Amino acid sequence: MSFNRTVVALSLAGVFCAACTNTSPNSDKYLNNDALVGTSIPFASEAVYFVVTDRFVDGDPTNNYEDQGGDHPTWQLPLEGPEGKKAYVGYMGGDLQGILNNADYIKDMGFTAVWMTPVHDNPDYAFNGDEPITYGGAFKDGGKTGYHGYWATNFYQADEHLVSDNLSVSDYTAKMRKHGLKSVFDIVANHGTPSFTMEKDLPGYGEIYDKEGNLVADHQNLAPEDLDPKNNALHRFFHNYPDLVKLSNLDDKNPAVRDYLINSYLYWISQGADAFRIDTIRHVPHAFWREASDRIREQNPDFFMFGEAFDYEANNIAQHTLPKNGGVSVLDFPMQKAMVSVFEKPLESDFADLENVLYLTHGPYNNPYELTTFYDNHDMARINATDNGFINAHNWLFTVRGIPVVYMGSEIGFMRGTAEHAGNRNYLGQKRLDQAKTHPIQQALTNIANVRKTTVALQRGVQVNLELNGHRAAFYRVVDTKGAAQTALVLLNKGDSAEAFVINDFMQSGEWVEQLSGQSKTVDQDDALTTTVEPNGVQVWVREGKVTSLALRDQIKYQLARQ
């Protein structure tokens, strides 16, 4: 693209965000009653690229520790599937250096932040308890390692597979910022490691160490009901009942546990975390997250957090977003489910199926514009879409309300349709990234992601739907505040033939500029904007300036009053 949108858009973003400082992430109270905006939180301007760090790129082979584990090795550990297919439950070599080496690749695609799986230290052995995991299996941990980072033995220490002699976690975050990328850290409160049913009690499993390396808790390979917290201090970090598979169940009611965890979160902020993704948030009571968010935001008022509540019922996951429960955003699972339904078979589906999950009015969320939106991740099957299905999914994801999140490799359709132990988390690698820029999915993603990156209305604007029907979608995104005023008209076509659009509703006179092509149209008063959108295409027409349509202003106020 030769059209340069950066100067105007960044100046608007800078003015707008200047008004955002020192405000609660879930508060728009500083705005006057005439302001038209979906959300004012600073993080709304971000687009997130998600990596399972060990499976991204091996940037430093010296930290692979291929001989680690002895009789319980940790390197690769393939699961054999049909027709030569494989998945892996051991370490594959990815590290922070691998992410840093590809910072410009990620930034150039249009992303502004990288969410990485937890950096915490994990056990140095494959787990020898539980039933053995097999290709395509689930909810079994036998034979697996903590390559993913979610089995922490020390919540304050980085795993040796991720850092390098010349690249600590704080070094990494500082260098990523120099590349224009924020760092989203993955945190856990529900559990530690798999902790019981081991044939032999292996070092690290069931154990938790403090910041100084002192042992503060040990499950001692005992079933939860056999723990004796009254007489054994090392058992007091745990509930005496199970939760997820054979993982230790951390006792969030214990003040020592709460302090240990929350202080670890504050520590990682000091090491450069810009936001948190919270694992298994619904497995920990709201009271814990209220205390955690209060303590975090006391020192970091604008700190953004979003949780994984793996539930497709909006009323259930929305409870986490309420201020009384900590005001934590969530991954938008209801939209994820709808996106898979629509974009796996775009020629057979209807855009109307996405309307209800937007919850633009009468919804349960504290603010739907602050949800993190996605179509797949590492805990579910990757979307089984064609290249055009991916392209249409991205065109939707980067123009509708919410903060988009894309899982590594999606830009090339990597391992499409595969679940966790069937290839979903397979190693991506530098070679694939080096070839990615010629892939049609990556090229189309780069175009629309960079439009969002430079268009304030797509980041924060109120969404006003005009048409969601069949292969066609048309909607406005509108910002009109003291600091920024911009209207974006989004037109989507997921069909295999061109679609003509004639937009009369809420149309405003003035110059409209299409952001992907640079084409300009001047619309006179009472005229329509007429255009044709190519198959599997998107157009984003932007008008700078305050809203002049009283009908549009009234519609936005109506929606915001009923949000």
Segments predicted by a language model, with ranges:
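Bacterial N-terminal signal peptides that target proteins for export
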Residues: 1-8
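Active-site-proximal helices and loops of the catalytic beta/alpha 8
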Residues: 30-31, 173-175, 180, 191, ...
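Substrate-binding/active-site clefts of carbohydrate-active enzymes
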Residues: 40-46, 54-271, 291-300, 304-309, ...
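Conserved, mostly hydrophobic/aromatic
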Residues: 51, 106, 116, 155, ...
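Active-site-proximal beta-strand/loop segments in catalytic clefts of secreted hydrolases
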Residues: 52-55, 117-120, 187-190, 279-281, ...
